[in-house]
Regions:
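Cytoplasmic helix-loop-helix junction between adjacent transmembrane helices
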Residues: 105-143
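Paired small-residue
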Residues: 100-108, 307-315
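Structural signature of the two symmetry-related core transmembrane helices
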Residues: 77-91, 284-298
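Helix-loop-helix hairpin linking two adjacent transmembrane segments in secondary transporters
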Residues: 132, 138-186
Length: 402
């Protein structure tokens, strides 16, 4: 096996761009393009939620697969196949003008995105020193915002009213962003897994000082908090363009440009943990950002003006990405890299199950009772805040017992 001569910071680019594709382009930008497909009469408005649920069904399948993979080499192979699947699916989606073909491609795209989101971050973090882990995690996960922003701005400028052109924009971005990610995966195939002695020692010390059952309970609470965040964001991801056009009266182009604020929020949400001193613990950070997310969701629900809508979308983007970044980092503090990958995959699996149930249940309400969808989203985020407060208190007990 070869040893890599590149600095570990190069790995973060491949990780960041992979997340940009899997989260930003595949998931976050679908609300924009789904609305354009409905305008083009490829699908009905109600089908946006249905396709999102199908996408998450594929996502769920991929998450379950990644969570059960024990071999590092197998995980890398799955992520490579997933990247190729995503590229092919997005290219073909721009040429599929009916619901059945879109359903198949959304399913495949979701499967691929799951393997990238679940398996890629830990691969990109393998060579990162422990003291840089939270910063590096933030940089990688900010890719979700970069992808969302690039997609929203690209569609807004080049294809504000054309579904085929919008898909072409996403396909071009996907191909370009995939190059560093595929290079990272090729490199990882040639390298042995680094021994994370510092992380292992830290984890063993934590478990010895704070019994294993309580650690497992803490991990479960963190996973459920992340899952509730994924459920709570659905009204914004799927129905922001619909609300912006029908409730506030914006044009489709303005709605797409407003959605770019979500991407900016995602980028900032990924970067904030990278610059905030470690004295602000990850467990406390999770509770604080859950409160920000709840404020953003409430503001989104009562928005009747462009300014309040813009602020709410930005806050929700920050909350979304910070929750993902901090959850991944916190899991890494509690367990080794392999267990972290599987715990992270489990978190995304449960979130995907909730996303499927929520989006499929609410798809019929989109046209006539969107306020009920918003209320359900706010309820989910309120539950997340309660869980994050609880996990912080449990983490504080852990620290006191050391």
């Amino acid at each position: 096996m070869k040893a890599s001569r590149t600095h570990w910071s190069i790995d973060l680019i491949g990780g960041c761009f992979g997340i940009a594709i899997a989260l930003g382009l595949v998931r976050f930008d679908f609300g924009i393009i789904g609305n354009l497909m409905a305008d083009a009469q490829w699908i009905d408005v109600e089908d946006i939620g249905t396709l999102a649920a199908i996408n998450m069904l594929g996502y769920l399948t991929g998450c379950i697969q990644q969570a059960t993979v024990k071999s590092r080499a197998t995980s890398i192979r799955y992520v490579q196949i997933a990247m190729i699947t995503i590229i092919a699916s997005i290219v073909l989606e721009g040429r599929s003008t009916n619901l059945p073909s879109q359903s198949v491609l959304r399913l495949l795209c979701g499967w691929g995105a799951a393997h990238v989101v679940s398996g890629l971050p830990t691969l990109a973090l393998e060579r990162v020193p422990q003291r840089w882990r939270r910063k590096a995690t933030g940089l990688i996960m900010s890719g979700g915002g970069i992808g969302s922003l690039l997609g929203a701005v690209g569609i807004g400028f080049f294809a504000p009213t054309s579904a085929p052109s919008a898909w072409n924009v996403l396909a071009t971005l996907t191909v370009v962003l995939s190059l560093p990610t595929l290079a990272l995966l090729r490199q990882r195939k040639q390298l042995t897994a680094p021994a994370s002695e510092t992380l292992a020692n830290s984890t063993n010390q934590t478990i010895s000082n704070f019994n294993k059952s309580k650690i497992n309970k803490l991990i479960l609470i963190i996973i459920l908090g992340f899952a509730l965040m994924q459920i709570g964001q659905i009204p914004v991801i799927l129905y922001e363009p619909l609300i912006a056009v029908n409730k506030i009266g914006l044009t489709p182009m303005m709605a797409s440009n407003i959605d770019s604020l979500f991407g900016i929020g995602l980028i900032i949400g990924g970067l904030i943990p990278s610059i905030v001193p470690s004295k602000l613990t990850t467990s406390l950070f999770l509770a604080v950002i859950a409160a920000v997310g709840l404020a953003g969701m409430i503001l989104f629900g009562i928005s009747n003006h462009l300014i309040t809508l813009s602020i709410s979308i930005f806050l929700i983007g920050v909350w979304d990405m910070m929750t993902g970044t901090l959850t991944l980092d916190r899991l890494g503090q509690l367990c080794n890299e392999d267990t972290q990958r599987r715990a992270w995959s489990t978190a995304t699996t449960i979130g995907a199950m909730g996303f499927i149930a929520f989006s499929s249940t609410t798809s019929q309400l989109a046209q006539h009772n969107v306020n009920l969808i918003l209320a359900m989203g706010i309820t989910a985020v309120s539950a997340q805040l309660i869980l994050e407060i609880f996990q912080h208190r449990l983490s504080a007990k852990q620290q006191n017992s050391r």
